[in-house]
Swiss-Prot record:
Catalyzed reactions: [amino-group carrier protein]-C-terminal-N-(1,4-dicarboxybutan-1-yl)-L-glutamine + ATP = [amino-group carrier protein]-C-terminal-N-(1-carboxy-5-phosphooxy-5-oxopentan-1-yl)-L-glutamine + ADP; [amino-group carrier protein]-C-terminal-gamma-(L-glutamyl)-L-glutamate + ATP = [amino-group carrier protein]-C-terminal-gamma-(5-phospho-L-glutamyl)-L-glutamate + ADP
One GO cellular component term: cytoplasm
Main location: cytoplasm
Record key words, sorted: Amino-acid biosynthesis, Arginine biosynthesis, ATP-binding, Cytoplasm, Kinase, Lysine biosynthesis, Nucleotide-binding, Transferase
Protein name: Putative [LysW]-aminoadipate/[LysW]-glutamate kinase
Function: Involved in both the arginine and lysine biosynthetic pathways. Phosphorylates the LysW-bound precursors glutamate (for arginine biosynthesis), respectively alpha-aminoadipate (for lysine biosynthesis).
CDD domains, alphabetized: AAK_NAGK-UC (cd04251)
Organism field: Nitrosopumilus maritimus (strain SCM1)
Amino acid sequence: MITIKIGGSVVDDLHPSTIADIKKIAESEGVILVHGGGKEVTKVCEQLGKEPKFVTSPSGIKSRYTDKETAEIFTMVMSGRINKTIVQMLQKNGINAIGLSGVDAKVIEADRKKKLLIVNEKGRKQAIDGGYTGKIREVNASFIKSLLDQGLTPVISPIAISEESEFLNVDGDRAAAYVAGKVGSDKVLFITNVDGLLMDDKVVPKLTLAEAKEIRPKIGPGMEKKILASTEALDMGVTTALIANGQKENPISSAISHDNCTVIEHE
């Protein structure tokens, strides 16, 4: 079984062979898709006159600050347009996909963060209200497995539900890692717009789990989250994490074959 995270930046730019590639893999093993879409959320926020706000953690991770209004827009865009567009593409190509958010059947439960520690404009650490951002606590693995058993391909948007039944924004890469770990996927694949982790403009072909943890603080914000998610997935029992480019031919099967991508394994 493989869990695939499709980054929002590549949803509209996937290689034409990608859907057929997903279909081929889905026929031989279960496929779970988790998607992003942050850029589309930002675009809709601006169209609605809501200025997007981003914050940076002391470790350098940049993330969206999600107040109540942003959480509503995030839910609308992620679980509406983006999720259903992906499901439509899959259905059009003979893949029996079902679109879900983490709210449906409590697929992803999270705890609302009370405080966020950020670095402010003056470069100082500051604690601010956590807004509607969540830390993933649980995944409804049995429900996801039941969909796979019926021959369905789940397509999950990273909106979680809190104990108080609030919509919470959770990071898509980490959502994919938790889904992969809890469901028991042997592989998690992060599809992005570069060939993997780049160091000195060259793809790093292989990392052990220990090496990935050691190297993570030295990596730029976008890829840093993917390395973090990869290590979390492996810590939860996933065998292999892959980071690959979705804009080349047959990106899924190429990554599974370890062709021109970054592979992270326990040893």
